[in-house]
Amino acid sequence: MDFLNKKIQKILFICILSFLIVNLTKSEISEVKDVSKFLSVGGGGTGGCQHPIYCNGTLLKTIQLTQVFNDSKTFVDMPMRTSIENVNELFNQLLLNTSKNGGPNKEELAAFLSENFYPAGYEVEPVTPVDWVPNPSFLDEITDPNLVDFARSIHGKWLELTRVFNTSGLCDGCYSSIPVNNPFVIAGSRFREFYYWDSYWIIQGLLVSDMTTTAKGMLRNFGDMITEFGFIPNGGRIYYLNRSQPPLFTQMVNKYFEATNGSDIEFLQEILPILDQEYQWWMTHRTTELTNGETGESVILNLYNVSNNSPRPESYYEDFTDAQSFSSVEEKDYFYSSIASGAESGWDFSSRWMSPSDNTNLTTIQTVDVVPVDLNSILYLNEKILSSFHRTLGNNSMAVYYQAQSESRVDAMQQVFFNEDTYQWNDYNLKTSTNNEAWYTSNILPLFADIQSSIDMDNQEIDLIFKSLANVLIAYPGGVPTSLISAQSLQWDGLNVWPPLQYWIIESIMTPNTTFSNMIGKNLIDRWITTNFCGWNSTLESEGGMMFEKYNANYIGVPGGGGEYVVQNGFGWTNGVDLYLLKKYGKSITLNSC
């Protein structure tokens, strides 16, 4: 069908949103250190960071474009030893003293930073989680002794990855971190702070490890973010305050509620208005209206759309350099907005967001004009969960509201995304008015959200999906590739195998519970756990057992590659996915040969 894009010009559901905001009492708002002095109200519903050191200004531009560090993120994670005013005064003096030579060189800038800044991550401290125990009960659910050792090692990594922000010895505004009240688990390596969507899998792993106190503390942190900013930022740094990430908070709360057997009603009562508030943010600031050219019917779906007209501070050099491909301010602004929106998607970056005519070239990025299948699948599941939560608390009118929202979304997704020939769901491009029919793991994510129960898709039709994808789902020893498009600069493509996507693929396959889908799912679970186990085992003596951020589909136990930084170890979401699978399927997992 032919759809024409219309930008939403009015605030949706304003009455409900106003009610929710008014009824957030002070008792529900935790104390967090104020960072509002460095925020301004930006487009797209976020308060963009205006910090003169970490987000804007000559100092940031000079440091990043000189490439004092190989990784642009290093500088913006370095706390200041003295006030903003002093740092700027000293920097201006440096510029004056070196003006005859064309400005400071890399060595002079490095010396300036050493004198006036602490090392990156100085204010982030390890902490021992209060609820960690050496022998969690889930280990009894695993049959293979090798996998028991593997699981115990992963469980032990929570001790290595749990952090707190400690800014007590730093001056006001002298750091980029967003302080929170409770300990949190980081991803690892360069990712020194908490991240929004990573935490969905981290929290699942914590719940498997019986660490409900730590998990609940992280949920409270996110609730505080929504109360403070209206949404959950990409991560725990002020330079992330112009964007969010895939909205998985509602599903995190649901996982906690399930793990505690629905007993923590008091917490649900506390957090539900905040979940409502986040939902309304996404429905107010991240929507597009599409009209059916044949029937005139309009539908509303969500997309990533960050208002941004400058390089991301943590990737300043890369963004600035790429933007030089454009001659006009309008083109650069579109690029910067789409780059930030690609980061908001979590898939930073993928051919999904590129121009169909040149989909391996990052400078063709057009994320703001792509309506994604996975985002709308996430929100569909959120709507069903929110309806259930409100029904649990006796809020029948809100339960009916969310049920209606989910039904409207299913109808819209079927109209806009569904391919009747392949039985897959494909992203929709607003510029070309066409669907992207290439294979991506996101193509079957609606099955994870159990859309099949709402559209009367029978088991035979579901099996047709998996049979048509058998060459992708079972052909690679290291797991299911993100796409079949190869581009070295696009890490969310090609042969990279990402833990969150493997989780979603496995759950999408296992949710329908057909004989064929269960067979395919079992095969994939075995391959995925094998590649993680082998990567861990081969580095056990030298590195203590490495858990990578991503893996290579072609090889067992080998990390993936590409993108803006080297492959990372740790790793929060890998640990969470593996613990979840080891508990759920631990009695039946078969390790393949390394």
UniProtKB/Swiss-Prot annotation:
The cross-references to Gene3D superfamilies, in alphabetical order and at most eight, read: 1.50.10.10
Catalytic residues at: 348 (proton donor/acceptor), 549 (proton donor/acceptor)
Q: Which reaction does it catalyse?
A: alpha,alpha-trehalose + H2O = alpha-D-glucose + beta-D-glucose
| Keyword annotations from UniProtKB, A to Z | Glycoprotein, Glycosidase, Hydrolase, Signal
- MF terms per GO, please? alpha,alpha-trehalase activity
Enzyme class, top EC level, equals hydrolase
Q: Which residues bind substrate?
A: 190, 197-198, 234, 243-245, 312-314, 346, 564
Please give the start and end residues of each transmembrane region. Answer: none
Indicate yes or no for the key word Glycoprotein.
Answer: yes
* A single GO BP: trehalose catabolic process
Q: Where is the signal peptide?
A: 1-27
Enzyme Commission code = 3.2.1.28
Q: Which residues are glycosylated?
A: 56, 70, 97, 166, 242, 261, 305, 361, 395, 513, 537
Keyword Transmembrane, does the record have it? Answer: no
What PANTHER family would the database entry show?
Answer: TREHALASE
Give the family from UniProt: Belongs to the glycosyl hydrolase 37 family.
Name of the protein: Trehalase
